[in-house]
Amino acid sequence: MSPESKGRQASQEPDEVIEELIERGERAMDAIADYDQEQVDELVQAAAWAIYEEERAEEISAIAVETTGLGNVADKTAKKRRKTFGTLSDLLGEPSVGVIDREEADGITEIAKPVGVVGAVVPSTNPGATPTNIAMMALKGRNAVLLSPSPGGLETCEKVLEYIHAELEKVGAPTDLVQMVPPPVSKAKTYELMDRVDLLQVTGSANNVRRGEQSGTPNYNVGEGNAVSIIDETADLDATAERIETSKTFDYATSCSSDNSAVIVESVYDDAIAALEDAGAYRCDDEEREKLEATLFPDGAGSLSGEITGQPPEEIAEAAGLENAAAREADFFLVEGRGIGPDYPLSGEKISVVLTTFAVPDFDGALETTQEILDYEGSGHSCGLHTTDEGHAERIGHAIDVCRLLINQPQCVGNGGSFENGLNVTLSMGAGTWGGNQLDENLDYTHFLNTTTVAEAIEPDPPTEEDLFGSYLDEHGT
């Protein structure tokens, strides 16, 4: 964007700013309307390479940590590269232009078309990875995307945009395919975007998600996390502890899929805690647990402190006044759950390297406690099970109302898809109607396609009444 354009937009009303950006996005879409599948896939590759290149990924991550104060550079760099690589693997070669499916016997042909200008509200926890991920999926459908960063994520998003534009120019595509709401960041402009785009995707605060759902714009907004892991009596405890440590500590638990609670069958509780300690955890006593709770939720009403979220463990220990030297050297903290619900905020999402543990008498109790935690916070999002009992793996799938359930995997790594499971790679995960979402799966490129279904006349071959009603009438009569 030219300095003149930036200056003009700074003096415009929010509705004028968003209207201009949408018009530019629509013109960019017109310019690629005739792109074939190969050209579209090249757009996706361009957006991916913009932040996958290692030096860029590290630079963007450093900006994100400096400006948001959340997470750490090494993990953010790894996340950008892993998620971008995985998403690109999912997208390349998949049909998204013109005829994408034809069923000759049924006379059905499906033709893919763009959804329009996509609005994406970007969270401060992933200010570099999320906009690129959304842009790749939107471009796969020949859409334009308009990004709305958080105040802390503005500089990161600007750098991401700079690199995406450079790559789009290399392939001769209009840079207005990917734009950003210009600074200063404001709710007025973000809300205007929510109201005016053709399709909306909000990943972030509960307030933004709720406002996006109330906009009336078709949306794929996603619910809050509060991932729970069950450790049953058959689990390999050392392997389980390593998985939970990975999930709990990665990027200082800024992910919505980071484990927040571990529900442990009583017969292995002490051994599981010991394994977690061996993996780097510090087990807090009652006094230390109270100190941590007061530090994480200083208002006493369950509101999470922004000063503590996404911080290194040593800083949390210092802020909470944990004087034990082992606490200052820990990778994460264990606190015993005393209850579930608003009066027990440690049972909710903490966005910090603090894991709440619950002892339960048996697997039935584990299922009951897990659902109770999710009913309080994180409905529909995710949970995990560490087990060697295949029967337990199937039972939990029927019993717990979540959209993704990982067996013997670190949730932070696996919920958003990986090469170790069959889930689509994404940074936006729907929680279904349980979480108040329209989306009940991992966001992918198919959500950014409109489809025209052409139905040709075929030779009729209807069933008989006997085919449809025979079994019912045999059982119940006429």
Labelled PLM ranges:
Residues 1-109, 137, 278:
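N-terminal Rossmann-like NAD(P)+-binding subdomain of aldehyde/semialdehyde dehydrogenases
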Residues 22-29, 33-36, 44-55, 64, ...:
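Structural signal for hydrophobic packing residues in well-ordered secondary-structure cores
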Residues 5, 12-14, 132, 140, ...:
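ALDH superfamily catalytic-core signature
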Residues 34-39, 58-61, 174-177, 252-255, ...:
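Flexible, glycine/charged-enriched surface loops at secondary-structure junctions
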Residues 21-23, 221-223, 252-256, 344-351, ...:
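Short, flexible turn/loop "capping" segments at secondary-structure junctions
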Residues 6, 29, 33, 323, ...:
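Conserved C-terminal structural/oligomerization subdomain of aldehyde/semialdehyde dehydrogenase
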Residues 97-239:
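Rossmann-like NAD(P) dinucleotide-binding subdomain of oxidoreductase/dehydrogenase enzymes
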